[in-house]
Amino acid sequence: MAKINQSVIAQILKAIGNANNVAQCGNCMTRLRLTLRDSTQVDKVALKQIPNVLGIIESDDQFQIVLGPGKAQAAAEIMNELLNSSTPTAQSKPSDTHLANIASANKKQLKEKQVSAVHKFLTKFATIFTPLIPGFIAVGLLLGFATLLEQITIQGVEHPNTILVEIIGYMKVFSKGMFSFLSILIGYNAQKAFGGSGINGAIIASLFVLSYNPDATSGFYSGISTFFGYSIDPRGNIIGVLIAAILGAWVERQVRKIIPDNLDMILTSAITLLIMGAIAFIFIMPLGSYLFSGMSWLFLHLNGNPFGTAILAGLFLLAVMFGVHQGFVPVYFALMEAQGFNSLFPILAMAGGGQVGAALALYVKAKKDSLLRTQIKGAIIPGLLGIGEPLIYGVTLPRIKPFITACLGGAAGGFFIGLIAYLGLPVGLNTVFGPSGLVALPLMTSNNGIFVGMAVYAAGLVVAYISGFVLTLIFGSKKIEVLKADVQSQKE
């Protein structure tokens, strides 16, 4: 697949109505997220034919172009450079067609319902957590390899090699560093995402990191142990931080409205912090604690129910398609706090296994030298490594039935992981977020050690592969080998 460069982005801009049609450009891990002024200007057929474009997703407030991991950020950076350097063209007289488009857009905006508002809220989580994901993956890999090395070379050894001990300790220290101060990073991103100043969010989040016990032997003592008679208990973890940062952004905007412009820099942040500190100590910390505990309890019990895990794994790709899968991230934090590992992630990762199995079934059924086989050859290796977009948007989703059987294959893998947990052996990721597919193997762990976690996860993938393959072979591979678009591509 071609590398993302200025030429590719120029083609994308042309297909979406040129630079003047782009109001805002951002990205998540796999998608270019655009806010367009007029979505009717998009040439979807031309857009889908551009190299690297795996698919498009339309929502009320965003036009998303699926590019895959490692490409979306580069694409957003190049596009923003082009947008900043482009000169706005003179606005011509509004035509009847243009006025009709404006009317249509206004009508669409007026029809937005609560579902749309919830979707917008959840998509902001991509802005909060996406910049942190490379760090999660990095510390997870280092911790996984360190634990693996520790169990092979040190555990049970009376006099372990000093150099190995130092190496293992060094590889583990990054995980401790990140998770010790992760709340501050999340507070910064959250307040910024919801329209406030990132630094205020970081300062508010730091209140959840500080210690309020003068006799504590660890942590950073804050200098106070009570707040006007209220005992301070910095619980609630990430849920409390998110609530505080989101509310803090709203408070900051309200304060800014009443502060004169010449005093904005001096007073707005100070007043915001004073208000939010009091609210955090009295209300958010206790409330966040209850919400965090409730969420942990719910998903711990759901993760141990095979039918519940089957539903989660089977529906996860739909959440990915609609861009609301980042809403699971606070749950990941809750499970890390409660269990010491993320037991939901391997369940959801089974969805990708079902896609791989379905694609292999289509490959078997497809004619030799067909375009479908060529598409699968290019997408199957990334799929095995946890990059599912090429398979989803290039192979299964356009043909509908294989996508459904792939989801059912993922559900079978989720059922297996849930059944093993129900029998007393839950497994999970050793970090909040990480890669899926085979790449996630070294990051798996359990209460019985890393090897057991890796074995259960690998077995779950095999179940998902086989189930997706068999279900697609029987129910999802009839009369779907060649799409009209494929025929056109072959003629060209």
Swiss-Prot record:
Topology versus the membrane: Multi-pass membrane protein
Every PTS EIIB type-1 domain range: 1-89
Main location, first listed in the record: membrane
One GO MF term: protein-phosphocysteine-N-acetylmuramate phosphotransferase system transporter activity
GO BP terms: phosphoenolpyruvate-dependent sugar phosphotransferase system
GO cellular component, one term: plasma membrane
Subcellular location: Cell inner membrane
Keywords, ordered alphabetically: Cell inner membrane, Cell membrane, Kinase, Membrane, Phosphotransferase system, Sugar transport, Transferase, Transmembrane, Transmembrane helix, Transport
Record InterPro entries: Glu_permease_IIB, PTrfase_EIIB_Cys, PTS_EIIC, PTS_EIIC_1, PTS_IIB_1, PTS_Sugar-Specific_Components
Role this protein plays: The phosphoenolpyruvate-dependent sugar phosphotransferase system (sugar PTS), a major carbohydrate active transport system, catalyzes the phosphorylation of incoming sugar substrates concomitantly with their translocation across the cell membrane. This system is involved in N-acetylmuramic acid (MurNAc) transport, yielding cytoplasmic MurNAc-6-P. Is also able to take up anhydro-N-acetylmuramic acid (anhMurNAc), but cannot phosphorylate the carbon 6, probably because of the 1,6-anhydro ring.
Description of its domains: The EIIB domain is phosphorylated by phospho-EIIA on a cysteinyl or histidyl residue, depending on the transported sugar. Then, it transfers the phosphoryl group to the sugar substrate concomitantly with the sugar uptake processed by the EIIC domain. The EIIC domain forms the PTS system translocation channel and contains the specific substrate-binding site.
NCBIfam families for the chain: PRK09586.1 (NF007152)
Name of protein: PTS system N-acetylmuramic acid-specific EIIBC component
